[in-house]
Amino acid sequence: MNNPSLLNHAVETMAVGSKSFATASKLFDAKTRRSVLMLYAWCRHCDDVIDDQTLGFQARQPALQTPEQRLMQLEMKTRQAYAGSQMHEPAFAAFQEVAMAHDIAPAYAFDHLEGFAMDVREAQYSQLDDTLRYCYHVAGVVGLMMAQIMGVRDNATLDRACDLGLAFQLTNIARDIVDDAHAGRCYLPASWLEHEGLNKENYAAPENRQALSRIARRLVQEAEPYYLSATAGLAGLPLRSAWAIATAKQVYRKIGVKVEQAGQQAWDQRQSTTTPEKLTLLLAASGQALTSRMRAHPPRPAHLWQRPL
């Protein structure tokens, strides 16, 4: 299957859903880019279905199903896609094409859906490891699927791809702490809140911004070794893919830096990168993609969170 309309749908989804990744996605070769965009479209669709949104915006009509029912629908359609059924929704038709073309294991897809299940059942996060497990399901396993699209099959490089997903999600959580709180979700370790004298009821209140900024700084700093680990994985990717991934890494890491630097004002406006900043980071990433091939990399640190094998 090579349906142009599926690619158009995926391009539109990326353009609206993730301006941070849209620039990086242009660096892939055409075949890889198609699959990357279509996998992203499926991930975004699943996220929106659970939240009863369209590309992050609230649905105009009240939900006709409960979150539990919507999750069951996603699971059913994912099983149908793997079974070879004709998929009529663009996001699932796109996913079916990608999964079949790149031999993406059903376990990865359902690991991703487990992240949405954690939201639906309002999972609790006591320690950082609990938060990292959530990060794995919503982003780390996406890194695994993306790496497979790029031809990666060895576990060492897959570990690094998962690490990048973990870093991205830690950055996401830091950036979106207040928005998530308004949506009734908290991914912060309860032990961290307790350390700052906060709880799930008051942590996002304006008067607690100073303490919240310290928690955000911890998240950003926790992401650093995962970004560093991901850098070591660039050598395992085709060069253009390495450039694209290095660009995404640089852009997203910069968002975390901005959250940390903004301190108490981090949530006055959504932290993002400007077009000139993206272009500067893109150029820096080209050098990183090249130099990653020219030096030996140390083994992955043993203290990092380990994905399920």
Curated annotation (Swiss-Prot):
What are the recorded Gene Ontology BP terms? Answer: carotenoid biosynthetic process
Task: Identify the InterPro entries for this entry.
Answer: Isoprenoid_synthase_dom_sf, Phytoene_synthase-rel, Squ/phyt_synthse, Squalene/phytoene_synthase_CS, Trans_IPPS_bact-type, Trans_IPPS_HH
Which key words tag this protein in UniProt?
Answer: Carotenoid biosynthesis, Magnesium, Manganese, Metal-binding, Transferase
Query: Which EC main class describes this enzyme?
Result: transferase
Swiss-Prot/TrEMBL cofactor(s) = ATP; Mn(2+); Mg(2+)
Its EC number is: 2.5.1.32
Recorded hits in Gene3D superfamilies, A to Z, give:
Farnesyl Diphosphate Synthase
List the CDD domains: Trans_IPPS_HH
Keyword Metal-binding present in the record's keywords: the answer is: yes
The entry lists its GO molecular-function terms as: 15-cis-phytoene synthase activity; geranylgeranyl diphosphate synthase activity; metal ion binding; squalene synthase [NAD(P)H] activity
Cite the residue spans of the region called Disordered.
290-309
Cofactor note as given = ATP is required for the transferase activity but it does not seem to be hydrolyzed during the reaction.
- Which Pfam families does its entry note? SQS_PSY
Protein purpose: Involved in the biosynthesis of carotenoids. Catalyzes the condensation of two molecules of geranylgeranyl diphosphate (GGPP) to give prephytoene diphosphate (PPPP) and the subsequent rearrangement of the cyclopropylcarbinyl intermediate to yield the 15-cis-phytoene isomer.
In its UniProt entry, what is this protein called? 15-cis-phytoene synthase
Q: Which organism is it from?
A: Pantoea ananas (Erwinia uredovora)
